[in-house]
Amino acid sequence: MIDKRNFYINGSWVAPISGADFLVLNPATEEPYAVISLGGKDDTEAAIKAARVTFSSWSMTTPQERAEYLKALLASYEARSDEMAKSISTEMGAPIDMSMTDQTGAGKSHLKAFLRALDNFEWSKPIRPGMEGQELVHEAAGVAALITPWNWPMNQVVLKVGAALAAGCTMVLKPSEIAPMSSVLFAEMVHEAGLPAGVFNMVNGDGAGVGTILSSHPDIDVVSFTGSTRAGILISKAAADTVKTVSLELGGKSPNLVFDDTDIDAAVTRGARFCFANTGQSCNAATRMLIERSAYDEAVKVAAATAKSTRVDMPNKHGDHIGPLVSEAQFDKVQALIQAGIDEGARIVAGGVGRPEGINRGWFVKPTVFADATPNMTIMREEIFGPVLAMMPFDTEEEAIELANDTPYGLAAYIQTGSNERARRVAAKLRAGMIQVNGSGRAAGSPFGGYKQSGVGREGGVWGIEEFLEIKSISGIFGD
């Protein structure tokens, strides 16, 4: 049993003041493999105090100095990336190859993007070109509370920590208690990078405890949260009494619009695989596939075949399979939503309830495809967070756009078409923060975030840094 009960506060690993033991389970075996502490009020207060005391000095460092610390952190991260990949794979079930390339790789990519953003960031400038004595200045916003999820641990931790460090903020990180071990390892990397004591602090805990204290504490200036929309609403309410800056990256129910002027086999195969990737545990997963009616029957066959050919296996095995869901609670939720799809009359063409054949332990699920879904079905409305694809036809471009936008979410949307003109026209009408056309990837440092109940603010690159900055105007200083 791995023992990681201590918290990282003010540059040291310290024993909990009021922590309670919490077992971390391996989702592939359902067995505990590590123990952490869930911090309490005293632990959280200690971390906030350390960050508050250090802010006055850290916020006065130059961007060049902060860049050197980020470079040192990147070096430590790269040197220990094998450890990180194994840690993520064990705690949340990502297959080891995917954990190395995508999960661990995301953290490295974000650190590099923040370094590029720092090189080009304009920290002060005239309000208008050539206007003397009227200056705009960007300054660190203060002490940041960073609350991260379990599904993409380092993607989210580095998006928040890297941006806050670049901006000159100090911080308290609360990772998900379900998958905390990668964040413990990350804290070790921060220590190796030599950041001043108190700049980065980490306290494990649950949302109701540490999360609520951080969100409502008067010495926290910024809250950056990634998780469910329900939890994001609660955090916003908790932060309101002290009027904090709140950045939220929340749920999604992203549409994938497939027009008949594209390569249907390639587009549907790609879309289904993206839906199933990370066992469907991605907020931007393309879980609603809307297909032009003339191509619908072919698309359903392709999606069903893709699901049936998607292998499910242990996370510690090499290959391009998918692993288990992260927890029993997540498994039960996904099973219930698959059953809801069946009960409400959607046609199941692949997968279904229960574990895959030959697997009787671990929170593994069958890649599942529903055809003939309708807009009001639960599987078309609720974020499932499992490898479950819902498909339905459309007749016109206008109908496709209307169906795509018929959701309280607006994180991402996907377009498959052979026409650039159509792609631009449709993209302009989709109410989502990120649009990807014909499988195009997103450039490193692109802004990540969405419309409506998918959140507030953006992460990544220069936009992520700006979430941790205040803008100050200074009038009346002339000359150098």
What are these regions (language model features)?
Residues M1-E132, V326:
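N-terminal Rossmann-like NAD(P)+-binding subdomain of aldehyde/semialdehyde dehydrogenases
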Residues P27-V35, I220, L257, I338, ...:
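Conserved C-terminal structural/oligomerization subdomain of aldehyde/semialdehyde dehydrogenase
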Residues E30, R66, I88, L111, ...:
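Residue-level signal for inorganic ion chemistry
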Residues Y33-G39, T54-M60, G107, L146, ...:
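Short, well-ordered beta-strand elements within core beta-sheets of diverse protein domains
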Residues F55, S59, L74-S81, A85, ...:
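Structural signal for hydrophobic packing residues in well-ordered secondary-structure cores
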Residues W123-A266, F394:
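Rossmann-like NAD(P) dinucleotide-binding subdomain of oxidoreductase/dehydrogenase enzymes
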Residues V222, R230-T374, V437:
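ALDH superfamily catalytic-core signature
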